[in-house]
Each structure stands twice: as C-alpha cells, then as structure tokens.
Amino acid sequence: MPITQIISASDSEAGPKPSISLVPDKPSEPETSPRHHRLSRSLSKFKRWRGRSNSSLSMGSSEQQELQDSPNEARSDDDENGYNNDNADDLAKSKYMMKSIAGLLTTASVYAGMNNAQEMNVLSQVDSEESDSSDSFQENIGQNEVKSKKENLKTKSHPEVPRLDKRKPTLFDFSITREKLSKDNVAKLRQRFCLDEQEPFLNDFPAWLLKDVLVQGHIFITTKHFLFFAYLPKNPRSVKMSGNLNIRTKLIRSTRYWCVLKNHLFSMYTSSTELYFPVLTIDLREVQKIETQKHTLNGSATKTFKLYTDESTFKFNADSEFSAKSWVNALKKEQFAAQNSENNSISLKIPLPNIIEIDDQPIVNKALTLRLRALESSQTYAIDDFMFVFMDGSGSQVKESLGEQLAILQKSGVNTLYYDIPAKKSKSSFGKETPATAEQKNNGEDSKYLNVPTSAVPSSENGKKSRFRFRERSNSWFRRAKPLEDSQVEDVEEIYKDAANDIDSSVHSTIHIHEQEDSQEQTVAWKPSHLKNFAEMWAAKPIHYRNKFIPFQKDDTYLIKETEEVSANERFRYHFKFNKEKSLISTYYTYLNRNVPVYGKIYVSNDTVCFRSLLPGSNTYMVLPLVDVETCYKEKGFRFGYFVLVIVIHGHEELFFEFSTEVARDDIERILLKLLDNIYASSAEGSNISSASLGDVQHNPDSAKLKLFEDKINAEGFEVPLMIDENPHYKTSIKPNKSYKFGLLTIGSRGDVQPYIALGKGLIKEGHQVVIITHSEFRDFVESHGIQFEEIAGNPVELMSLMVENESMNVKMLREASSKFRGWIDALLQTSWEVCNRRKFDILIESPSAMVGIHIAEALQIPYFRAFTMPWTRTRAYPHAFIVPDQKRGGNYNYLTHVLFENVFWKGISGQVNKWRVETLGLGKTNLFLLQQNNVPFLYNVSPTIFPPSIDFSEWVRVTGYWFLDDKSTFKPPAELQEFISEARSKGKKLVYIGFGSIVVSNAKEMTEALVEAVMEADVYCILNKGWSERLGDKAAKKTEVDLPRNILNIGNVPHDWLFPQVDAAVHHGGSGTTGASLRAGLPTVIKPFFGDQFFYAGRVEDIGVGIALKKLNAQTLADALKVATTNKIMKDRAGLIKKKISKEDGIKTAISAIYNELEYARSVTLSRVKTPRKKEENVDATKLTPAETTDEGWTMI
C-alpha cells in the first residue's frame, strides 16, 4: 500500500477524507497560448484531451513550474474523451488494501516500530544531544552497548575486516604504450616546427608540462632543438561538465542555477530544461584567475570557489569540497585551452644552445620533475622556466640525452649556455656570432646562436658573481589573455632562436599591439549612433550582412555597408561570447513572446539564432542552435498590426516572435528555412541531428577515471588538474592496477534485479568483479548472465501474502504484521552482513529499499552508492514516488513528502537496526541526522528525458539513463506470434501490447472481458500478456477466463526489447523498466498505475506528451485511450523524438562514469559516519586519515 493511503484516502477507493492535511501552495495562473494553425492547433487539441488546461508539451516544463511555490493546475476530472471519467467503474481496482512492495514494507515497519517506542524516545534524546555537540556523542554513545555485548562479539565467527590503518596504499605507476615515429609523423612535426629536412629526430619521451594545469604531451629532441607538443582535448561541441551551483552576490545571499561548461563558455540557467536562455555567461578567455577559497584557520579547501575577470569577481558555492574541486579543475582546463592553444594543440620550441640549466628532482616512486631554464632574449636577458613531470622515470634519460647533444654542439664550435658542460669557453666577445660550421651554414635560420660566455650565466656552481643581470620570466607565453594566432606562435618560437637580431618580434610588443586592438574594438562596440539606431528600431526593417552561406544581391536594399559590417559582427560576438567562426547573416527588431512580451533584437548567424532584450532592466538572452530547430512558419499576430513567426524546436515548446512589419517576418522565415535546408542536406541523418547545447554531458569513463585519478594525486599534495593528450598516435587510457570488488544489493521483484544485472555486466567489461546479492529465486537469472550470485533473506513476497489475506486493517493484521516484519527484517540484516563481510567488497551499491547497505558500508569502511528507479532524493520538483498526489500541489508539498517518508520509514526499522549495529556490526546507535542519507551518492537509472534532474539536486545525484538488459539476440519468437504480427500488418491494423504484470484484482474475469471489448471497439490487434488474477501466486493467472477473438493473442512473457519495436502502442502498469522499454521503442504509452512509483511514471508520461495516464480502467476508458494512442500523430511524433533521445543515451556507461567521479567523495562520506570503532582495542581515528591512506588500489596510465 502506498504511503499515500496511510495518510489519506485514494481517489480509487471509497473512504473518509484524509486525516492528515498537507496544505498545498496557492494555485498558479494557467498558462495561455495563442491560437494558431498547423502544429500549434494540434497541440492545443492535444492539451485538451490530456485533461490539462495549463500543461505544456515541452519536456521538463512542468518541473520548472513545480520548482516554484505555485503548483500547476490540477488534472481535470472531466475528460472530453471519457477515459478518465470519475463516474466510471475501475475494473482494475486492487482487491486488497496493501498494494505496493515499498508501501508494504513501510506500513509494516510502522506497526513494528510502535513496539519500540521506548527505544525511539531514547534515540530522540540522542538526536537533541547531537544537535548540541557531535563530539560528545562520538565519545559517549554506544559505549555501554559495546561493553555489554563484548562477549557476544568475541564469539562471532565472522572474519575480521581489515582496518584502514592496516591497508597499504599503492603508489601510482604510469606508462604510455606508443607506436614508433613513422615517416608521416616526422614530416608533420617538421612542418609544425619549421625544421630542416637535415635535422634528424634523436629521441622522444612522454612527459607532462606543468603550468596551471598538467598537460600530457611528448618531448622530441633533435640535433638542434628541444620540442614539446601536445594535442588538447577536441570536440568543442560537447559539454565538459554540468551541475547545480549556488552563486553568491552582495544583494542576494545565494541563488541556485544549473551550470554548463562547454568549450570556452561557462553558462548559468534557471533549470536543466531551459538551456536556450542563459542567465549569465562567462567567457573563460577573459578569466584571469580561478581558485578555491581556503579556510582562514587551517587552510583546508572549502565548498566555495571564485572566478576573477577584469570587470568583476564571481563567487560560487558547490555542494561539497569534492564538487568544488571538480569544478575548479574543469574550469582551469578549459581556461588553459582557451587562452593558450591554437588549432587544439600546444607546441614549444627551444634551440638547444639557449638552454641554461637542467635540474631534475624525484617526487614519488619513479616519478620526477625536470626543470628546464632557457634564455628568451638578449635584450631583456629574460629567462623562461619550464617544468616537466615524468611518471615513468624517463626524466633522467631526457636530461642525459640533452647533455650529450649539448656536448656535441659544444665540440662542433657552437657556444651554449648550459654550464654543466666541461667545454672550452669561447674567446669571442659577447654579442658576436660564433663562426659557423659547414653544417650550420647549410641550415640557414638555425646557423646563428647567441655567443654568451658561460661565466655570464647565473649558477650555484659559479663562484664569481655574474656581470649580467638576468630577469626571471613567468612564462608569459602560456598566460596570454587572448588565444594566439599561428603567426604569433611562430614569433614566440623564433624568440628563442633569433632574438638578438629580431627585436621587433618580442613577446612584449606583440601583446601590446593586441591589447590596443582589443580596446579599440571594444570602443567601437560601445559607440553606437543613437539617432540612427532609433530610426532603425522604429522602421524595424531587416538588416542583411555579406556572408558565404546566404548570398544577397549587391542591390539588396537591406544590405549593410561594408564599413559597418565588421563592427556589427564584433558586437554580435561580444554580446554572446562567440568566437570568430560565427558570422552574421541578418538581424531584426522584434518581440519575444513568452510569459510577457520582451522587446529586443534577433540575430541570425550561420548556425545559431540569438535574441537580446533592449529594454532597460531586462536581461533576456537566447542562444538557439539551428540544429535544434525543426521548422518555422508564419502566424497571425496576437495584437493588431503585428505579424508572428513560430519557431518549432525539438523537444521544447515553440517560440513566438512578433514583428511590426510583414516584410521582416517573411524575410527571417525565408532565411531560416534556407539555413535549415542547408543543415539537413549536409547531414546524412537529416532531422536526427542533435546538439550538445541540450546540456547532456558526454559521459566518458576515461574522463571519469581521470577525475578519480586527479582526486588521488590531489591527496598526495599535487593540486593541479590533468589534461590528457589526444594524440592519435599515442593512445592513452587509465586502468586500475587491481580489480574492484563490487557488491550490488537489492530486494524486490525481477524489475528491481534486472537493471543491476545490466550494470554488473558493464562493470565486468571494465575489468571488475561483481556479485549481485538478492533473493534465491533470481539465482538462475543472475548466473545466466555470467555474474556471481549471493543469497539473502528478506523476500517481500512473504509480507505480501500477509496483506493479501487481510482486506481491511484490523487488530489481528497489526499484530501479525508486527511480528512477521520483525523476523523478516532481522533475517535481512543478518544475512546481508554475513555476505558482505565474507566477500570483502571494495564498493557497495544498494537499492535504498533494502535498508541495510549504508550500515554495512560504515562497518566495512568502504564507498557506498545508492541506485534506484524512482524519486528518493529530497527535492521540490517531484513528490516521493509513494506519495504522489492526485493533483500537483507545488514544491513545498513535494519536499514534505520526502521528509515524511524518510521519518516514517526510519521509525519502523530504527529499533532493530540500532540493536543490530551494536551487537553485530560493533557500531554505535545512529539516527537520521548521523546517517547523512542525503549526502550519499545516488544513481537514478532513468532517462533524463522523463526524469530531468532537478535544480535542487546535489552534485552527487546523477540521472544516468536507463540500464537496459538486451535479450533480443537470444530470443526466438514463436511461429504463432510472428504469424499474428504479419496478419495485423497485412490487414493494415494497428498492433498494441497490453500487459499489467502479476497484479491481484477483485474480479479477473470482468477485467478480461472489459479488455476484449475495448480492443474490439478500438478496432486494433492486441498482443496480450495476462498476469492478473484474484489470488497472489495463482498458477492460472496466465490463462484467460473468456474466449479471445482472433485479433487478440495471449502470448505470455516476451522480451520487451524484441516485442515493442513490432507494435504501435503499449498499455501497461507503469513500472520503471516497462516504461523505459516502451519509450525506447518510441511507442505512445497508456499507463494504468496500481501502486508505488507507477503513479509517478503515469504522470510523467502524460506530462511530456507521449502517453495517457488512466485513472480507471473499463471497456470505454481503455477503448478511448487506445484510439488516441494509435491515431494521434502529435503523440506519435513526440514519442519518436523521445526514442531518438534515449537511443543516444548510454545509461550504463554514464553510471560507471559517475561511480568513478564520486568514488573518493563516497569514501569520505562513509568515513564521516564512522563514530565508534568495531572493537575498543581497534580504536582508529578514521576521520583523520587522508584518502591516500584509506585506499589500497592504484591506477595505471597506459
């Protein structure tokens, strides 16, 4: 029974009014949309038959409304089509009061918890004491219990768990498997560095260049040069990182935004579903500094970090120190790439004679640093320092190779600055050229070297004071505020080579010139002609720009002058932080109609449509990639004398723009349609093109491993982000030195176990060991996929049978529920601990309904994750899956449902859990405050298209996508089924699937008759999976009570991934897995929920416009729903769009990436819960251990 039925009566059941009233917020005003033809008119019809006056078809729009205090308008009870008529009978009404597994557990736990009132009172006193002093709790709580159970602990036969102080940390080993330099690669390097054909390559070494970031690349040593080259991460369209952050300001203490880091732009949005309207965008090319704020007392990192620009300072608050560090690392990488790279690469070229000093220092194990100092210019005597890190011990070989080649140059008559070479000093004076050898004369540009006496070089070994004063440089080449052009890179490289003869090519003059140019451009951008602009705004005529995408005629009356074109493009790029790839095609003055019309300017570029408000006090910006636009069309104006253009966006509500002239509206429509035709023509996928602007991070396990690796080296004291070289000839991957042991713990039905099997197979492919811990009935299912299995007690079917026997709540039922639940949970606790303790897992992932994992992880002191299919995290966006109201009640209610469920759930199990913790685990008693459940990393195996991450989700809460377990490759369909499908297709009939699982209803025969009547009236063919019956576990449930007509086939269980692509619509109970399978196949979905999270997913399917939520099921309501699901084109198209989005998700890979990303954070959360040791003599202060001291795993860079 859902917890809703504990506190209120369900609409589907007769009963008194709720005894507990959860006061909703004030209802919000319904949204009004203009009436228009084509798609919009169909959409308005679609909204009406869905029974909502204010529900938008845009994905995630309802969530944004729910984040506000005002809830959406409730679903209408009066339905035009009649399939949700409250006066109709519900033949699928459950016969029994208790209907949900989680509801069963919760309800039974309440009854069992009533017997532990005295223990709860004691624990509530602990709660109040904890709020005053957590330290006193740590010292006092649980000591008496540990002492009293000391003898019992000694008699336990469980193996001892190795404590953290006894685990030996493994140092990191690095190696890179690379191919030998081919002739093509050598030729490319010669071209890149402008090397002579007669200058051979001597050696190459993998190395890391240490700047603000640690850049992985390669060192090449030739006969005359020291070269470093690195490919920076490519794919500028991908989102590097996204998540929620709080921005602190002076006026407003803190505001929470959805933040997206993409290429050189760091953008903030109001929610994860409104990604075309940034609230703030920071250009990382203009950022001067990024730093984590430190504690003033101990200097440790905080959750706050800052971004400094020339104009302002931005202060951000993350959800944890780990999250703040992750954001800082990601931002520093993109800042470095934006400010220091050209063509996605970094190159460094130093003539060997300019090298002054080479110093190597060991770090840990084989790793060492190599400091290289080189003279930059004879005019300034500036010396550049370059620091390289070698992880495989090759740094000493680099030093040796450089020393040998410098000695060869010295012997050949070339004066060098390297003081370690015992060579004769040149007799020629400083500043004159050394006589060149024949080889040098042939080499042209490399034949001139600075003739500097080695005594002039500052050295610790040189006893005499130098006559020359060298000025230290801070590597300005890497710290330029603007990206370098190719010519500038070359100038910088030439400084090391011919600085004495080419003073005009110095770094200083180059930067100085560009600073002047930038300031001039900004001055031009902010000197508009006010009278002219006012006239243009009043006339509202189109403005065309010369471009190579949409050619305009020379006599075009709207074509702008060439003298104004450059400044217009510069202003456009300045406003929206674009690079030079963006070029304007046309601009218009218009109104953007959302909630309130906003006057501004719309910009059309080669691949983007942008809007900027022009009204004082308004700060509306829009950046819409054209690849996300489906089409656009003309519409009548909302006001007299105005003309509307409607832009239709994939998976988003339409945008309406009002123009004061018909000419401007028609002109932009023509240009947009032409650009869309060009985009679709250039892609083989046509309208399937998608944009990374939708904010979906491309989760790559290698990137996640890199983040974990960064966390570990940060713990070693190296707080610097890593940038992996993406050289196609040197493939880099990160793998653990040891295989992790994953324990996946879950209880429930097949739908709860199946996603864990899919995740387990993915982890095994990563090289880890996986054990699934669940009930014995799933042993064959788990082991058939090659995954190890461990059995535990706690099968909820035992409790369900008790609820089935009692149709109403009575004293007998309460007593039996209490006694059986206590024994049930005792067995679950004990068997789960025995398995996990014996297996010695490294990481534990648990379904939170299993209740035991968080305590076992604390006892074993291992990272702990939660994974589930329904809302379990406190949020204002969604109610708890077991307390879904009949109408939307707003954010306050949603948040309250989570708090209520947590307290009710814990109240029922806390007595037994605390006793088990003390007697078996050797831990102290705990409570909700000490458990820190909201800080546990959480993985939702649901698609973000149906469950968009809420703006108030913490950084460690990830919506990964579905974990599909594909069985279609091994399934062989029966001939009867194939013939039935062929018959339906040959007759042109729609084919639907109907199945509700193994539910218990009041009258199974009447329900079957109603289903047959509905299928006949809808005139469709039906593949039936009958599982309903009047008794739990009825063996005859699969058989039909009535004769089925020819157009209905009862086939039983068929893999959804095979069957659903064969049908046109699906009708089911709304379980997470079944809903995911139907949406994955692009099917309009009709859901008749029965219990638990099924009500939640029924509402979500209806919210995003791909299905219908049936309140009651009978012949008429089901027939009406089937007609709509099989004939409505808008719903079919919407379902097809969802299919495309889900097909591009990889839930398993994203989940594995999230595990790597949050592994160190999960470990820290577990350690923070450790309050008392398992045994008194093993008193280990685990809270003081560093992450490096609490792990025994290592990682290898391959």
From Swiss-Prot:
Residues annotated to bind UDP-alpha-D-glucose: S749, R750, D752, N1025, N1053, V1054, H1056, H1069, S1072, G1073, T1074, D1093, Q1094
PANTHER family (UniProt xref): STEROL 3-BETA-GLUCOSYLTRANSFERASE
Biased composition (Basic and acidic residues): 146-162
Domain GRAM: 187-236, 570-636
Keyword Lipid biosynthesis: yes
Family: Belongs to the glycosyltransferase 28 family.
Bias (Basic residues) ranges: 35-51
Annotated region (Disordered), positions in chain: 1-89, 124-162, 427-465
Protein name: Sterol 3-beta-glucosyltransferase
Membrane topology: Peripheral membrane protein
Sequence ranges assigned to domain PH in this UniProt record: 238-336
